[in-house]
Every structure is written in C-alpha cells, then in structure tokens.
Amino acid sequence: MELLVFVSSTCAHCPKAEQVVRIVCPEYSEYGLTYEKVRTRSQRGSELSEKYMVMSVPTLIFLNDKGIEINRIIGVPSEIGLRNKIEILLGIKETFLKKIFGNKKKWTKLIY
C-alpha cells in the first residue's frame, strides 16, 4: 500500500501533515506501507493532482498495490487517527462495526 501526501509550499497546514506522516508511516513499513510527498506545483504533482482530483491540501491518498485509490484524508490527521486508518486499511485492526457484527457472510446466512 502506498500513501501519497499532497502538499503545497503556500499551505500553512501542510508541514504538520508531513510531520504526522513522517512519524507514523515508518511504523508500518514492515507491512509494505510506503509514502511519497507530492508537491502539487511540480510537473508530477500537477499530473497526480489531476488524476486523483485533489482539490485542497494537505490531502493524503491511500493506494492499493495496483495504484487504485482505496481511501483519502483531507486535512491534517492526528497521529492516532492516521494509525487507525492505516491499521484498518492494512487489515491489522477491525472496524468498530466488524467487531460488533462480525463477518458479513456469517450474518447473511443467519438472515436468509
């Protein structure tokens, strides 16, 4: 999984978002998480911003192994919030509803 961190040099909140990513993401490198800082005013940044329809910065976009967007965060995430999101997307942590209701297939069998 890859995390693209869209930032701009004129953005007041982007340095904080970058700091949170630099602190949290290395903890998940053993799970295959990589991250890349994307400057929206660069050639590549402009192309990626258009491709993923980034309208504001900071924006964090999670991509699966095929490069398809699976989630995004707009704004500055907290360290805890980013950890939770990463763990859910990597399958390390179950969502609250999954903890309560369990596997959807199991419930489907009970209902029908």
Predicted regions: what they are:
Residues 6-20:
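Conserved redox-active cysteine motifs that mediate thiol-disulfide chemistry
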Residues 45-47, 61, 80:
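A broad, structure-centric signal for solvent-exposed, well-ordered loop/edge residues
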Residues 1, 15-16, 22-23, 50-56, ...:
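Non-globular targeting/processing and membrane-anchoring segments
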Residues 6, 30-45:
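Thiol-based oxidoreductase modules, predominantly thioredoxin-like and allied folds used
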Residues 8, 39, 73, 77:
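Conserved residues at beta->alpha junctions
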Residues 3-4, 60:
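Hydrophobic beta-strand anchors of alpha/beta hydrolase catalytic cores
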Residues 23-31:
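Short helix-loop-beta junction
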